[in-house]
Amino acid sequence: IKTDSIKIPDATPEIIAYCMDFAKKYGYTFEHEATYERMCLVNNAVYIAKYMTADRCEALYGYTPGDCKDEGGEWTATGTQFQVPYVFKTLFSKEKIEFTDLCETKTVSKGAIYLDKNEDLPEGEHNYIFVGRVGQFCPIMPGKGGALLLREAGLTDTGERKYASVTGAKDYRWLESEAVYQLQMQEDIDKRYFNREVDEAVEEISKYGDFNWFVGDDGVAPWTAPDLPWSDAQEEAARNFDVR
């Protein structure tokens, strides 16, 4: 039986051994899957973490947990927010952004998806193009022939079909990714859509600590650095209370 994992901050070999032995009393066997050098846990289902290197694990435990053998020093994301390829590559892995990273798959459970190519039409006019229940799209910059990405939303009182924006597509224009690739429109992809997701990820991590330290490679937490800009002021304030 595989159970959910437990995560223990600053786990020493003694703490790990205690957990292993305690589990055995109740018939469970724990495995030390990984040690993270740093981790930001947003909720029970979403986190971003960096595996500790194999060398550091060996020095700390005398062995290397399985995931750290294969991915030591690499980042891992659980949950959609940090798994988005553009977000993960931009903020964490620093891998090259590929065309596929600029594509979004959209689905609807009822009705169908439509592209409304109305950008060059008079206000109030529409050109609905049927897509289906699933499609892959790229956000397109204004003025480049993009369309509104819509879904069927029932009927009006007069029996006319109503449309609403597909989830996550509002405020942007779109084209099917296959068309973007074939027409070589990669330069027309609206990066603002993806940069917004990057900004939201940074904002989320910043709720729990210093983002620049979290993604940095120096391994020094900002609150322990000796050259904090306010250190001198704090020392001076402390001296004001010295017994003279």
Where are the language model's segments positioned?
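Catalytic palm active-site di-aspartate
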Residues: 1-9
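C-terminal, non-catalytic extensions of nucleic-acid polymerases
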Residues: 13-244
